[in-house]
């Protein structure tokens, strides 16, 4: 239960993250709220059991620390909590649990006062997946098992509360969603009960609706209020190193604060011991009508997708699609070891072109092909041939196959014999 609150314990005192601001003279000021448990005039360790059972003769104390850069620390008077609330009811709290709830409420209130409004340049791009249909072995070498979640084929969205109390909902590319009032209304209610500095990372989705329809609704100024927001992660801008398993614990606690939400949901988590268990879950999710599965490294930090960075702490599992496309040209890779390695260029019926990586050719073969294949040889032997292409999905914007890899030609052709 202690892990459900932002912050950490040091010397038996739990401190929430500092809320920082700037003084009129330009110095950095920090405000911190803390909770300690005292029994017989001694500060004792805070345990999870204290959130469900009171400790005899123990009281909880809340206090704040305030200091300005290069200045002394000022500590407030103690606020003592001697009993819980709603005693005898389902939602009863112990002394310690009530103290933490009171401290969180004060923390949020102070954060609202000090937190500046977001601007578009202040949006944090969400974490992106690096691995496709590969789960690194390191995921299973951690003390905590990796987490598997359903992968919905929806539109990525991140939510946060601005300094004026309004809700900002933005896309993977940091574009604000102007509609979705049904979701924003519930987010505003939810932020009354949780840390206002938290970002909620998820997907806009409606089960069994095509991605094109979902994207149209998400980007409309006036939508049909049918989309739901499925939250699969959360993060704090000043605590990006927080491991994934703790973020998931905090996310669970967030949703416990308000359980009557209709359009906002926490994505279900499944712990797995090995790759086979993850693959079985992927197959189950696909049968249920979902796109596949996401695997999260339990100890992985939150790594924002700045400059299209893809995090090595995420893996996506989903079935591959394949189709035949007309080969119209060839080119080479642009950087690293792909520079000088041949790539095929295919064309869609609407004349849009896309690049395809040969799947079964070694780099040595690809280098040799690009070096020796002439336009004349290409036109004579390969131009206009049907190429079988394996891909992850079609781009909802362009219809172009994504992560395209050439499996082979429809008619038997050994491209290495051409040169």
UniProtKB/Swiss-Prot annotation:
Alphabetical GO biological process terms: cell division; DNA recombination; DNA repair; DNA replication
Entry EC number(s): 6.5.1.1
Residues annotated as the enzyme's active site: 151
Region annotation NTD: where it falls in the sequence: 1-120
Catalytic activity: ATP + (deoxyribonucleotide)n-3'-hydroxyl + 5'-phospho-(deoxyribonucleotide)m = (deoxyribonucleotide)n+m + AMP + diphosphate
Ranges for region OB domain: 318-419
Annotated keywords: ATP-binding, Cell cycle, Cell division, DNA damage, DNA recombination, DNA repair, DNA replication, Ligase, Nucleotide-binding, Virion
GO molecular function terms noted in the UniProt entry: ATP binding; DNA ligase (ATP) activity
A family per Pfam: DNA_ligase_A_M
The keyword Ligase appears for this protein: yes
Annotated spans, AD domain: 121-317
EC top class named in words: ligase
GO cellular component: virion component
Keyword Cell cycle part of the UniProt annotation: yes
Notes on the domains: The N-terminus domain (NTD) plays a critical role in DNA-binding, catalytic complex assembly and catalysis.
Miscellaneous comment text of the record: Consistent with its intracellular location, ASFV encodes its own replicative DNA polymerase and three base excision repair enzymes: a class II AP endonuclease, the repair polymerase Pol X, and an ATP-dependent DNA ligase.
Entry function: Very low-fidelity DNA ligase that seals nicks in double-stranded DNA during DNA repair. Together with the viral repair DNA polymerase X, fills the single nucleotide gaps generated by the AP endonuclease. It is not essential for viral replication and recombination. Displays a very low adenylation activity towards DNA with 3'-dideoxy- or 3'-amino-terminated nicks compared to regular nick DNA.
Family of this protein: Belongs to the ATP-dependent DNA ligase family.
Designated name of the protein: DNA ligase
Originating species: African swine fever virus (isolate Warthog/Namibia/Wart80/1980) (ASFV)
Taxon lineage: Viruses, Varidnaviria, Bamfordvirae, Nucleocytoviricota, Pokkesviricetes
